[in-house]
Amino acid sequence: MNNNLQGDAIAAAIDVLNEERVIAYPTEAVFGVGCDPDSETAVMRLLELKRRPVDKGLILIAANYEQLKPYIDDTMLTDAQRETIFSRWPGPVTFVFPAPATTPRWLTGRFDSLAVRVTDHPLVVALCQAYGKPLVSTSANLSGLPPCRTVDEVRAQFGAAFPVVPGETGGRLNPSEIRDALTGELFRQG
């Protein structure tokens, strides 16, 4: 197993994801760590790595809206709300949608909703397309440390053997904006 994900980085990353492990990859502003959203084992590994409580809920990042549909309930959206969301995607805006009862609690935490984003980062788009589904995505940093912005910073925080998809972040300074899909309420400024 090649932990450095050299050569065909996307195929190597998918191999790691299929082993229910966590990977790091560049996103719009910082490096993210992510895993298979359908694997409780993988999500628990990510939460342990980040020292993040399960009740906080997580974000899914996807190549397209279709990848997110199994995890969210968009039946209450009006045409105007859909237009607002789709005008911001793909891009650095995360929307919180109602979640159906079938969405695992290891993703939603204590909430009946799930934060999701359709990314515009080409490497993450390619990764999610090749994987065939979204990834759990949270900033690559250990508790109390700043988010990683380079491969070297990821290796400094998580160790030289941590699987990293090499690449550059999208250059944005701030993490994604987070808004409620139904009300438009701003939860986090981007």
Swiss-Prot record:
PROSITE patterns in the cross-refs: YRDC
Keyword Lipoprotein: no
The EC number(s) this enzyme carries: 2.7.7.87
Annotated TM spans: none
Keyword tags: ATP-binding, Cytoplasm, Nucleotide-binding, Nucleotidyltransferase, Transferase, tRNA processing
Reactions listed under catalytic activity: L-threonine + hydrogencarbonate + ATP = L-threonylcarbamoyladenylate + diphosphate + H2O
Domain (YrdC-like): residue spans on this chain: 7-190
Compartment annotation: Cytoplasm
SUPFAM superfamilies per UniProt: YrdC/RibB (SSF55821)
Molecular function via GO: ATP binding; double-stranded RNA binding; L-threonylcarbamoyladenylate synthase; tRNA binding
Main localization category: cytoplasm
HAMAP family linked: TsaC
Function: Required for the formation of a threonylcarbamoyl group on adenosine at position 37 (t(6)A37) in tRNAs that read codons beginning with adenine. Catalyzes the conversion of L-threonine, HCO(3)(-)/CO(2) and ATP to give threonylcarbamoyl-AMP (TC-AMP) as the acyladenylate intermediate, with the release of diphosphate.
Alphabetical list of PANTHER family matching this protein: SUA5, THREONYLCARBAMOYL-AMP SYNTHASE
Similarity annotation: Belongs to the SUA5 family. TsaC subfamily.
UniProt name for this protein: Threonylcarbamoyl-AMP synthase
Lineage, uppermost ranks: Bacteria, Pseudomonadati, Pseudomonadota, Gammaproteobacteria, Enterobacterales
Gene: tsaC
